[in-house]
From Swiss-Prot:
Organism: Dictyostelium discoideum (Social amoeba)
Any one GO BP annotation for this protein: sorocarp development
Protein name per UniProt: Calcium up-regulated protein B
Coiled coil: none
Annotated function: May play an important role in stabilizing and/or regulating the cell membrane during Ca(2+) stress or certain stages of development.
Pfam family, one: Ricin_B_lectin
Annotated membrane topology: Peripheral membrane protein
Source domain of life: Eukaryota
Induction notes from the record: Induced by high levels of extracellular Ca(2+).
Gene that this polypeptide is encoded by: cupB
Amino acid sequence: MINIEDISKSSNQSEEKQLKSTSSKPKYSFAAKSLFKGSNNITPYYLSTSNTFQCVASESIQTWLLSDDGHIFTSSGNFVLDVSSGGYFVELVQLNSNSKTQIWTIDTTNNKIQNQGNGKYLDIDNLNICVAPLNGNATQQWTTFRRAPIPTGNWGYFQSKQMDSNNNYWGLSVLNNSKSYNTSVVMNKVQAKSKGQIWQMTNDGHILSRLDGSLVLDIGPSINGSTTNYYLDTNVYKANDLKQQWGINENNQIFNQYYPNLCIGFVGELGVDSTVNCVLAQPSSASDINFQWITNPTYSLNEIVSEVPEPFPAYTSGDLLASYQYLSNIATSNFTDDIRSLYTGINVSLQSFLSIVTNATCPSSIHSTEDFSNVQNQIKTELIYAIDVRLVFENYSGFYSKLFSQGSSNLTNLANLINVDMSSNQMVNANYTDAITSVFYSLISEIPVGGSIIANIGQSAVEWGELISQSNYQGASTYQVELSQLYSHLNTNYENEMANAQSMKDTILQDWGMMSKTYALCFLPTNDPSSLNINGLNFEKISDVASVAYEIAMIQMLLPTTYQIYFTPAGYWVPYSDGDFAYSDNSGTYIMATIEYSNSYPPKELTDKLWNNGVSKQEFFWSAYGWNLATSLTYYNMANKFGNIYKLAFPTIKNFTGVPMQFVMTNDGDNLCNFPVKTHFAKFFSIYYSCGDLGHHYFDIAVNDINDNKVANFTVDINLEAIEGSYVSIKTGSLVVQPGYAVGNPICNQGSYSLMFSASILIPIYKSE
């Protein structure tokens, strides 16, 4: 039996330690999978924060933090696992360091999780989590990993394991890249710049399309009236609809939560039939390749470092130990008799070590030539593996260093172009992790073959950084920073991410199982989503795509300090309806101009950096995905009631999460309007209302998610001054944010009396693990 702390060690040896009585501190991230397979003998179940075993492959609700004194925390660190007052079911409660029922012991040898308060074992009762006396059933058996196996919240492809006759991968695709609901989902060859092939699995198991913030994978019509065969299509994101929720089992099948025995597959021959429809049906077997899927990127390194550590073959005595020490000494010129300790060394040549070990002969002091040969062959193999693993990370570090160097040199130029004072104390939202993730998205979107290799390494390093940040390691910081500190902020985060990659590499190089599995990935075909084979990659193209994506991310940070969007509803006059700084749709016209002057537009050099590099005008002007510009309601040359628009302020809620939200604004109890907010989109409150006389006016805003769970509450303070545009801010002390969410720096822009536009305020909401 091992103490919880030992799960993080690079050893599979077990030991028993006395639990401490001090207050706990979260240290290590883990996930626990039950060996119970469910009624279909396929579905894996993971310990979940919902108090029910959910088979959704979701990271946050199935990731826990293990403290060194035996507490099991939720991933947010807000609650711990406890036994209910009835002594049977478990529940999530606040930490009580005096309660022994909040202390658990994980026995990795016998796959058990035991409660120290009552001695019972974690169990399953009708898919509810409970504790029971030892019974030998599979429901009491658990395997633990360093984190849940499928990262959620990242964009990528779902590719079939079945390739066509030309060895091309095909993936889930929205027919004709249509944003319309009830559009068929079919198989298409994976190709660049096809948003209809890019998806994101959310924390609750929805599969969200990159085409639109409310478009998800859904069950379509029945095939010939069958109750076990359905087509797939897209639909609007719905609350608590199991037909829209999915999971990935250990057979790489994507199953439906409402029909857990049915999985996604396809009918037809890839590359031959004109249309190959995706279906929801019963696989013929667990190995039916038409029902097996690969995520791209696979985050293969994330999976490897999540596995139970496997130590190197041990040489502890006799000629085996003598052979190991002899080879270590001659290879390192007597620097050390433990050559494995240098696999992570920066200033050592493993290639030189390999040459010496390969040419070594058994000395007379070692009697067993067989033992010497066995050790020699093992160390040769380890060195070969270590050399290739190091090369992969060296290439990634070179790519990442070049990316940051170019981005840093461009930052000053961008600041001048956007007219930003980089010495000011103005706050900006600078989510570095999102910026880097957007680079990986661009790589897989524009270079599906090759770009995924960089994303596999980079995103796994991000995940690794989040994992080890629980052990007081400094991960990437996010959200708010002063402009004067932006460069330092970016540099610190760059160094942290480089350190994350270095730490992950060192962990792999000190573990025989991880090293072996990583080495194997280096020889997969380049188009394999799990591949780390860098031979033949077009690094120039990869660098160009990444550089543009990073520059766009920097623009997203800087632009809201100088510019905002001016929206005029359809039917009213506007100075421009299209062009470099304008966009129109059925709702009205959006114009980008400076915060102070609605008639001062951005230079063409700036807009060229947007539209010439593939930025979607709709996403930009709607503040979707990485864009977060505040929006002012504007009526040009109006003398009627709209001429008082400068007295008002209109809020925009930006949803950076994978769950739809809604917000309502009220004034003295009167509901002004409810607005839905799509995932990764912003929603602008565009209803005209009456504000009143000079002075402060307060409007309450409540934000809930689609399941009506509270997200945030705050009060908007609108201050009217004589012959001035209104001032807007969040009332001090009014902001309340629920656990699991974070609110970034609100963007507050004053209205204008002379130019007749309203004040604007954008409130960004992020998911916080």
